[in-house]
Design a protein with these regions (language model features):
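A cross-family signal for N-terminal binding/gating loops and helix N-caps
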Residues: 1-348
Length: 348
């Protein structure tokens, strides 16, 4: 199989990029029968009818942190940081983070800056990705308070507006529990509490995984032969309780439907050859593209993804390249909204 990135491009008018969400339970879903059959556009709550008792929905319970902070150099220059992940505190108990920074020249090792009003020191530069290790003159708990007060929602780069108060709720899913993501697992944004209640009442299991989505989710693939692409790592965890729920559903003949590429990444990373799971935590670098055979996932609910991205490749691995691009063409022709705050598709 040829791995040409240019084969996964599609055209779309810029006005279809959703800059705000329609609201939980108020989006549209393009239903794509996995084994053929006519695709059709449904209102999000209507997808409940497509599930059977005994099916299992797998969601990501990560919580987006207000990870974008602004500050200044000692000379008054404006700077911006995106906190990627918390690191072990310093010996004296100060908070340390790996961060993406701008402009890079302001963040030389040994430099002192003021970020969100906090004295900040540059400890390391990562040669590979340009990320910095920053030490803040606050404890981790104090730094969390600073972020909640001064931090901004890290909206995706293609949403061309500043974040505001609405985003604090809109960019958080109803499943969000464990802080650590710098991007939302956006497929879960389609679910309202009522939809969740209706699914459970129907006898659908709901299992949770945790994958802290990193900024690498928006990373462009820079090589035409995408098999040479080096995937970013993301921290994940699957508890015994949730592994048991998924395994029971599978064993009893239910369909396992992952909500989003992030949940998919976790269960396919962990699944054994027979598609069963054990509790596990770690960092996944898994990269799924056409040719990959899914071990566990029977259905996938996901948003429409950026052309030539690792995410559209993951979907194409599940649904096939031609099917995926045909579905995207139908979405564009019907003016469905695209990307993080947009509409979605259910392959089942």
């Amino acid at each position: 199989m040829e791995c040409r990135l240019s084969d996964y491009n599609f055209e779309f008018p810029k006005e279809l990029i959703a800059s705000r969400t329609a609201g939980k339970g108020k989006t549209h879903i393009l239903y794509c029968p996995k084994n053929g059959g006519e695709r059709r556009i449904m209102k999000a709550p209507e997808i409940v009818d497509l599930f059977r008792p005994g099916d299992c929905l797998v969601v990501n319970n990560t919580k987006v942190i207000p990870a974008r902070l602004y500050g200044e150099t000692q000379f008054g220059g404006q700077v911006e940081v995106l906190l990627v992940q918390a690191l072990n505190p310093s010996e004296s108990g100060e908070a340390r983070f790996e961060a993406k920074v701008h402009p890079g020249k302001a963040f030389q090792v040994g430099r002192e800056l003021k970020i969100a009003g906090v004295r900040t020191f540059v400890e390391e530069v990562h040669e590979e990705d340009g990320n910095r290790v920053l030490r803040f003159e606050k404890t981790p708990a104090e730094m969390e308070e600073v972020m909640n007060k001064e931090g901004h929602v890290p909206l995706p780069p293609y949403i061309d507006r500043p974040d505001d108060e609405d985003d604090k709720k809109a960019y958080q899913t109803i499943f969000a529990k464990y802080a650590g993501a710098v991007a939302a697992p956006t497929a879960s944004l389609h679910f309202s509490e009522q939809m969740l209640e209706d699914l459970k009442a129907k006898g659908v299991y709901v299992a949770e995984v945790t994958l802290h989505v990193g900024p690498g989710t928006f990373q462009n693939i820079s090589v035409e032969d995408f098999s040479q692409h080096k995937m970013h790592g993301e921290h994940y965890e699957l508890t015994k309780e949730n592994a048991d729920i998924i395994n029971k559903a599978k064993r009893d003949g239910g369909r396992v439907v992952t909500v989003g590429t992030t949940s998919t990444r976790v269960v396919e990373t962990i699944a054994d050859a027979n598609g069963f799971l054990k509790p596990q935590r770690g960092v996944t670098y898994a990269f799924f593209y056409p040719g990959y055979k899914y071990k566990l996932v029977d259905g996938l609910l996901t948003n429409f993804h950026w052309p030539k991205s690792s995410l559209i490749l993951l979907v194409s691995a599940f649904y096939g390249r031609e099917n995926t691009l045909e579905a995207y063409k139908m979405a564009v022709e019907n003016k469905l909204k695209l990307f993080s705050y947009g509409d979605g598709m259910l392959i089942l």
